[in-house]
């Protein structure tokens, strides 16, 4: 069970990661990351279970540049709920290197799924166990 208060901001990444000791292969893919905020633009869901520190797309892009990662899958987190705008924004800014996994409700429409696909989302996830988010 999550014992972190929603009011406690949790750092979820290293501010100064060190360069990797090995050279990654061509087309290396980071297969599961999240982006958070900035909150001034992408509100956190009131239903979230914790409050991660902002980890915007620019930090992700800088990390990937440092590590030599050329492709990535960004997974929508419960932090932003089913408003997938933060991932959509990162995909758009990623220059074709990023794809997404959207978080949707069970009653998502075919039209919304088509829209998400047109914006670079290639999968969806559901959150059946909200207490674990």
Feature map (PLM): residue ranges:
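An N-terminally biased module of ancient metal coordination in phosphate/nucleic-acid-related enzymes
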Residues: 2-82
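Active-site gating/metal-coordination segments in enzymes
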Residues: 4-12, 81-133
């Amino acid at each position: 069970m999550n014992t972190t208060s929603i009011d406690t901001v949790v750092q979820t990444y290293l501010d100064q990661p060190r360069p990797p000791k090995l050279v990654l292969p061509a087309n290396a893919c980071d297969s599961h990351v999240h982006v958070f905020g900035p909150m001034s633009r992408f509100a956190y869901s009131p239903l979230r279970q914790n409050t991660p520190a902002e980890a915007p797309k620019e930090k992700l892009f800088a990390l990937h540049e440092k590590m030599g990662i050329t492709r990535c899958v960004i997974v929508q987190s419960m932090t932003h709920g089913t408003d997938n705008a933060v991932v959509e924004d990162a995909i758009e800014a990623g220059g074709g290197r990023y794809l997404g996994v959207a978080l949707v409700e069970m009653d998502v429409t075919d039209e919304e799924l088509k829209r998400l696909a047109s914006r670079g989302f290639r999968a969806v996830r559901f959150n059946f166990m909200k207490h674990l988010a």
